[in-house]
Amino acid sequence: MGKEQELVQAVKAEDVGTAQRLLQRPRPGKAKLLGSTKKINVNFQDPDGFSALHHAALNGNTELISLLLEAQAAVDIKDNKGMRPLHYAAWQGRKEPMKLVLKAGSAVNVPSDEGHIPLHLAAQHGHYDVSEMLLQHQSNPCIVDNSGKTPLDLACEFGRVGVVQLLLSSNMCAALLEPRPGDTTDPNGTSPLHLAAKNGHIDIIRLLLQAGIDINRQTKSGTALHEAALCGKTEVVRLLLDSGINAQVRNTYSQTALDIVHQFTTSQASKEIKQLLREASAALQVRATKDYCNNYDLTSLNVKAGDIITVLEQHPDGRWKGCIHDNRTGNDRVGYFPSSLGEAIVKRAGSRTGSEPSPPQGGGSLGPSAPPEEIWVLRKPFAGGDRSGSLSNVAGGRSTGGHALHAGAEGVKLLATVLSQKSVSESSPGDSPVKPPEGSSGAARSQPPAAHAGQVYGEQPPKKLESSSASEGKSAEAVSQWLATFQLQLYAPNFTSAGYDLPTISRMTPEDLTAIGVTKPGHRKKITAEISGLNIPDCLPEHKPANLAVWLSMIGLAQYYKVLVDNGYENIDFITDITWEDLQEIGITKLGHQKKLMLAVRKLAELQKAEYSKYEGGPLRRKAPQSLEMMAIESPPPSEPAAAECQSPKMTTFQDSELSGELQAALSGPAEAGAAAAEKSSNHLPATPRTTSRQESSLSGRARHMSSSQELLGDGPQGPGSPMSRSQEYLLDEGPAPGTPPKEVRSSRHGHSVKRASVPPVPGKPRQVLPSGVSHFTPPQTPTKAQPGSPQALGGPHGPATAKVKPTPQLLPPTDRPMSPRSLPQSPTHRGFAYVLPQPVEGEAGPPAPGPVPPPVPAAVPTLCLPPEADVEPRRPKKRAHSLNRYAASDSEPERDELLVPAAAGPYATVQRRVGRSHSVRAPAGTDKNVNRSQSFAVRPRKKGPPPPPPKRSSSAMASANLADEPSPDVETEDGRLGVRAQRRRASDLAGSVDTGSAGSVKSIAAMLELSSIGGGGRAIRRPPEGHPTPRPASPDPGRVATVLASVKHKEAIGPDGEVVNRRRTLSGPVTGLLATARRGPGEPAEQSHFMEDGTARQRLRGPAKGEAGVEGPPLARVEASATLKRRIRAKQSQQENVKFILTESDTVKRRPKAKEPDIGPEPPPPLSVYQNGTATIRRRPASEQAGPPELPPPPPPAEPPPTDLMPLPPLPLPDGSARKPVKPPVSPKPILAQPVSKIQGSPTPASKKVPLPGPGSPEVKRAHGTPPPVSPKPPPPPTAPKPAKALAGLQSSSATPSPVPSPARQPPAALIKPASSPPSQSASPAKPPSPGAPALQVPTKPPRAAASVVSGPPVASDCASPGDSARQKLEETSACLAAALQAVEEKIRQEDGQGPRPSSIEEKSTGSILEDIGSMFDDLADQLDAMLE
C-alpha cells in the first residue's frame, strides 16, 4: 500500500502520529543518501473520491485538518458526489472545523451534485452555529437544491426551530417567504408552511405565520390545510383554521381539505379533523324537516327528519352541499340536498345574517359580494363553538381566507374522488364544469366562485338531482347501518370500497360477496339471507334518457362519463353493447360500480327492445340469433325485380328463441302478450296464443291473424279489410322502416334477443295493427323477424305455429344473429311456428288476393312470394334480396319477397326461406343445421303431439344437397328476376307466393300444400325457373300457386340446408308423407302419394285440386304429389313461384313428426328432430316455405343440381320436371340430414325419380295450373335420391313412388314416426284441406302429414286421402272459423279452377285455411316438442 493510501487511512482512523510521519519532509542529506526525494500526494482520493481532508472534515478533527491544510491540501476538492470538505464540516456541525475550512477560503455557495450548499446541510440538521457562520460568510439562503427546497424549507420540514428563526431573521426573509412561480404546477413545488404542516411542526408554523407567510399559499397539492388534513395532523389543522386559512380552497384535483379527509383517511384523528373542517367550511347549519333520499344520485345526501346538516356550499342548480356527522360511528356523509329540506338552526351574525332569513336565502349574503370577513363570520360560529376559539385572533386572517371560501366554491373542479365516495367530491361546489356527466354537481362546479358563494345557501331548492346515487358518504353510512343490524358491520369497508350501495347490494349474489372479500361461509350466508330480505327498487331509469351523461347521472355514476366517452361509448345506444370485460378494460374496476352499470345497461337494453318492439317490432329483428334458418326478408318489397331477389337483401334469420315477447308483440298486436310468454317459455310456450289465434273462427279474426303474419312476412296483398301487423308493415316496406332500430341498437338488442330467440314468440296472434294493405309500410329489420312472426301470425290461428315461430332472431341479419347451439336447435321448432302463422293468415284473410297478394306484399316488408315466372310480381325478387340476410336461405331458397306473393304463403315462405338458403345448403353440417334449425319442422310436429324422432341425417344431407343445388337454379332464372337458384330460394321462402305465375298453379298449389303438410311440398312445387315457363302455364293461378308454394317453401326453407330444410323435414319427419307416397307407388292415389311424399305437395294438390277441380282433379293431385315432392326440393333450391303453398306450414309440422328419421318413433322425438333431424324437421318447414315456391321449380333448375337430396326437387323446378331435376342426391351443406336420407334412399333413385317427376317448375309443379308437376315431390328433399327415383317412376304416379324411394332410407323413422306423426299431420291436415280446393281436400294436408308421419309408402297412401278429409274435419274441430275460412277458400279455388291464374288467389285463401289447420297442428306439435326439448 502506498504512502498516499496510508495517509488516507491514518486520517480516517484519526491517527495523527502516522499522518504527521507521512507528511514530514525527509532530511535533504538522508534523502539524497536514500535517493528518495519524492513528496507524498496529500490530495490522493480513494475510490469514493474522498481525500484525507474530506475524512478530517467529516470527523471534525481540527488537528488533522490543520496538518493537511499546512501540507497544501486542496480545500475545495470534490468527491464523487460533488461534496467538498466544507459540506462535510457543515453536515458534521462543529464550529471549529468549519472555521478552519472557511479560513482556508472554501466557497460557501458552491453546490454539490444534488444542489445542496453547506447551508442546506446545516439547516437540515439544525446546526444553528454553523448556519449562522455560513450566513456570516455570505451564504445565500435562497438557493434551492435539486428538489426545489431552500435551506428554510429543509429546516421547516425537519422541525429545526432555531435555524428557522435564524433564517427568518436574516435579511433574506421576505425572499424566502415569497411564493415561487410554478408552485401550483410544479410537482415538487412546496413552501415552508406546507412542509411544516405536513410534518406537524406547530412552532415552526407559528414562526412562519408571524413572519407573514401567506397562509393560503397553494401548491399543486393545495394549501397547508390539505397537507395537514391528509397527514392527519389534527393540531396543525386546528392551528391553521384558527389562523384563518381558507378551508374551501381546492387543489388542482378539485379537492378541498375535507374532501381529502373523506377520501383518504380513516383514522380516529381524521374524525376530529373532519369535524374541524366541517365547522370551518360551513357557513350555516340546518335541521332537516323531512326525510330525503335519492339513491339514483351519487352526489345526493340522504337525510332523515331532524338530522343536523352542516351546509358547505350551494350548487348552481339551487341544491345545497351539506355534511352530516354521525356521532355514533364518527362517519361523515357529504352530499347535495334540496335547499327547501331544512330550516336554519342558527342565524349567523354579521353581514350575512340579514340575508339569511331561511337556509335557502341565507346564502345570498355569502355571495361574492359578501366580504371575506362575512364569510369568515359564517364559518366562525362553528369554529368558535367547536374550536374553542382561536377565532378571536383569526378574524384578520380569515378575511384573507373569506374570499377563499368563494374561490373554493367557484374555482376548483370537484372530482368525484374528493367525496368519500368520490361522488362526494363531485358534489362539492366550486367544481368547474369539469364533468358534464356529473350533472348537477358539474354545473355547480362550473359556477363562478362568487356566484357560487352567493348561492351557497341555496336560494331555491335544487332544480334537479342529476347525479344518480347518494354520495359515497351517505351510501357508506347506509351500508354500515344495514350491516350493523345483523352485527356484520366489519364488512362495511368491503362494500363501500367496492362501490356498492344498498340498491346494488340488493342485487348481489354470493359470488359477488366472495369477490369483495366476504369469504367466511357463515357470514356470506347471513349477508345473502339479509340481501334477499332487502326490498329496494333498482332505482334504474324507466325510460331511455336523451344522452349518456343524463343516463349516468340518473344511475349515480356520472364520474365515468369521461372514461366511457374516451373509450368510444359516447352514444347512449353504444352503451348497451358494453360488457363486464369492457368495463374492466376501460378502467371501471369497482365491482359495485360494474354491477350497477351492467344492471343499468340491461335495463336500458330492455327499454330499447320494448321501444323497438312497440314501434317496429325491432327487437325481433335485432334479436335474431345466429340461427339463419328463420330469416325474415327486409329487402325491398317483392315488387322489386328479380334483381332484388338476387340481392338476397335483408333477410334476417329468425331464431326460434329469438322471438321475444316484444317480437311477438310486434308480430301480432293481440299476440304481443303471448309472444312475451312464448319468449319466456321454450319455443312452444306461445302455444296458447297460437291456439287463441287459431280459435278465431271468424274470417275477420283470420284476417287479423293473416294481417299479422302478413305484416311479418310481408305477404302479398292483404285484403284491405285484414289489418296488417306492424311486423308486416315493416316487411312489406322491405326497406328499413323509419322505426327500424339503428344498427347499434339492433346489435345490442341482438345480444339480448339471442336468449329470447329460443323462446317461440306468440305470433299466433296476428298483429291486427296493420291493415291488409300495409304493403306501403316499410318494415325495419324487424320484418326479417317479423316474417317468421308472420308465419306465426298466420299460424296464430293455428296456435302451434304461432308459438313456434319465435322469429325474433330473424330480425337480426344472419351475421348479427349469434349462433348459439340452443338457439339453433330451438330454431327448428320455432321456425315451424313461423311458417304456420303466415299460411293461416293467408287462408284466414280473404283480403290477400291469391294472385294480387304479391303486390301488397311490398307493403309488407317480407315479400314472401317468389317472383312468378310471369305472374309473380316484381317484388318477389325482393324476397330473393331478403335471402341475403338469412344465411340458411341459399340461392335455391326463394326469398321472402317471392314468398310474399300470397300473404299467407309469403309469411310461411319467409320463415322457411330463411332456413333454406343457399348458404345453408352449402354449409351442410353446421350452417345448414343452424339455418334449418328444424324450427318450422320441430314446431309443426309439436302441434300434433310429440313430434316423431328427428329425421335421419341422411334426409338432412339430402335436404342440404337440395339447398346446394337450389342456389344455382335460383341464380339462373327465378322468374326472370333471379336465376333458378334465386327462384328456388324464394320458392323455399315464398313457398306459395313464388309460383304465382307458374302453370298449374291451383294443382301445383294443392300439391305444394300437400307437400307443405308433409314439409317438403313447397320445394316439390317449387316453381320452374324463369327459363321454364312450361310448368307455369300448367298452373292456372300463379298467385295461388305462389301462395301454396310460399307455404311449402317456408317449410322447406327451414331445413338445415336452408331450402332443403322443409324437404328434409319431409324426408326425415314429414318426409314420412313423402316416403309414404313413394311407398304408395305411382299407382296409388296421387293425393295420398303427394301427402306421403311431401305434405306440401299434397296440400298443394288439395288446394289446387279443389281450385282446379276442373283442371285435373285427382290425377293432377297425384302428379302434383310427386311433383310437389321434387318441387319442394327444388323450391328450396330455386324457390319457384309455385312456392306459395301455405300448406307448407302444415307440411312442415308433418315433416316434423316424420323427422323421425333417426327412427325415433314417437312424435315427441321431433324436438330431437329439431336438432338431429332438426335439420330435417326444420327443413320440412323450409319445405313448407319452399312448398310455396315450388311453382318456381321452372326458374330454379339450378336448384336441381344443388339439392342432392332434393334431386327430385330440382326436376320439379324445371318446367319439364324430368329433364330439369338434378339427378344427383346432392348432399347439401347439411349432409348430416340430407346425405343420410339421400344415401338411405339412394341418390340414383332420386335421380331416376326426378326424371319422371318434372322439377317443381315442371308441369307437375305447374300442375296447379292443370299440368301435373312430376317434380312436385320436392318434399322428399331429405331423401333426395329416393325422390328423384320417384320422379323417374312417374310424374304423377311417381309422385307417390318417389316418396317411397326416399322412404327406404327414412322408412324406419317414418314408420316410427307414423303414429306420432299422423296425429300432427292430421292436425295440420285439417287446416290444409280447407285451404285447398275440393280436390285439395281430397288430398288433405293432414293426410300428407299423416303420410309424413307414416313414413311407409302404403300407409301413407291410404292416409293421404283420408288424412285430407280427417285433416279437414280436424281443422273444423279445431276451429269453426278456420273451417269456414277454408271452405270459403275452397269455393274460391274451385271457382278459379277454370280461371287459370285465379286459382292462385283462391288457393291463397285455401292456403290460409290450410295454414290455420297447420297452425293448430303446429300448436299441438309445438307443445309436444316443447315438452320433449324441455
UniProtKB/Swiss-Prot annotation:
Residues 1147-1159, 1388-1406 have a biased composition (Basic and acidic residues). The modification Phosphoserine is found at S358, S423, S432, S635, S648, S722, S727, S790, S890, S892, S988, S1068, S1258, S1362. The keyword Phosphoprotein applies. It holds the Pfam family Ank_2. The keyword Glycosyltransferase does not apply. CDD domains: SAM_caskin1_2_repeat1, SAM_caskin1_2_repeat2, SH3_Caskin1. One of its GO terms (biological process) is regulation of postsynaptic density assembly. It comes from the Eukaryota. One of its GO terms (cellular component) is postsynapse. This is Caskin-1. It comes from Rattus norvegicus (Rat).
